[in-house]
A protein has these predicted regions:
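The substrate-binding groove and active-site-proximal loops of carbohydrate-active enzymes
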Residues: 1-9, 60-78, 119-130, 189-198, ...
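Active-site-adjacent "subsite" loops/lids of carbohydrate-active enzymes
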Residues: 2-17, 27-87, 173-174
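Generic structural signal for well-ordered alpha-helices
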Residues: 12-16, 81-85, 131-139, 179-180, ...
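Aromatic-lined carbohydrate-recognition surfaces of secreted/lumenal glycan-active proteins
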Residues: 16, 20, 24-37, 94-101, ...
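Conserved, mostly hydrophobic/aromatic
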Residues: 19, 77, 84, 93-96, ...
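Active-site-proximal loop/short-helix segments
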Residues: 34-50, 70, 83, 87-125
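Substrate-binding cleft/loops of secretory-pathway carbohydrate-active enzymes
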Residues: 144, 149-192, 197-208, 231
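Substrate-binding cleft of secreted/luminal carbohydrate-active enzymes
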Residues: 179-202, 216-259
Length: 259
């Protein structure tokens, strides 16, 4: 496709109609914090958010990101969500990349940290920034259409569990997602943790999500793409065991990434 081109129809309206014909729900998938590399941004020209909302955008490692620490970022994201929820009969809003870049000590938010942190550590302030975005959008969606589900796909391991360590890569510390805090506050309807692992890197963490769900739906994302010989050459029974585990322990279902 070409950026800005008119396909001659409304793709989202088409997808919703076709899903509903088949008794399926349609959730609008929205990438949140990353904006793309310089080439992607340049292709959008004056339509890029980096031009329209320069104050909330920051460059980092040859890419552009929304700055979660800027108060106007949640307003901008809510404006996008509002357009979708008001105009379309979607069943849900699903957020991807609602996180900081991985291990980003030099992410350029020092000015906002000094201005807004109020004595919190940098890590806690960043976690609070993401939580405030989640809270603000969740409440906004429910005020418009209470039946629309709000969900996120976070990093698959929340943090170390009593059963098994996360080995230094987790939602809480690596990308500042306090997802179990969101569940505890009730500001997510569903969580799709990206559990693209197997063995001890899958089962203890899937169980941890379910135990901390606060009655919300936990739907693990399974790494179906690892069945491809060029990706991981997993055997089919690996995925089958994960599916049986999910059903046996009462999780709400599974998502398949990527088919």
């Amino acid at each position: 496709g070409k950026v800005g081109g008119d396909p001659g129809y409304d793709p989202l309206a088409f997808a919703i109609a076709e899903c509903h014909k088949r008794g399926m729900e349609c959730h609008a998938w929205m990438v949140t914090i990353p904006l793309g590399n310089r080439k992607h941004v340049a292709a959008l020209g004056k339509e890029s958010v980096t031009k329209k909302k320069r104050a909330i955008c920051v460059p980092y490692k040859r890419e552009y990101f929304l700055n979660p620490g800027h108060p106007q970022t949640k307003e901008y994201l809510m404006s996008l969500v509002r357009e979708v929820v008001e105009r379309y009969d979607v069943d849900g809003i699903h957020f991807d990349y609602l996180r900081y870049p991985e291990n980003a000590p030099r992410f350029p938010d020092s000015y906002d940290y000094r201005k807004y942190s109020k004595g919190r550590s940098l890590a806690q302030w960043r976690r609070d920034n993401l939580t405030e975005i989640v809270r603000y959008i969740y409440k906004g969606v429910k005020a418009m259409k209470p039946w629309v589900k709000v969900s996120t796909c976070p990093v698959g391991k929340y943090k170390d569990t009593s059963r098994y360590p996360s080995r230094g890569w987790n939602a809480f510390h690596t990308v500042y997602q306090d997802v179990q805090g969101w569940l505890g506050e009730g500001i997510q309807d569903q969580i799709y943790p990206m559990l693209y692992f197997r063995g001890n890197h899958f089962y203890p963490f899937a169980l941890d999500w379910q135990e901390q769900s606060n009655g919300r739906q936990i739907i693990p994302g399974l790494g179906i793409y690892f069945l491809d010989p060029s990706e991981g050459n997993w055997t089919l029974d690996e995925i089958e065991r994960q599916m049986h585990f999910i059903r046996a322990h009462g999780l709400a279902g599974e998502a398949h990434y990527r088919v």
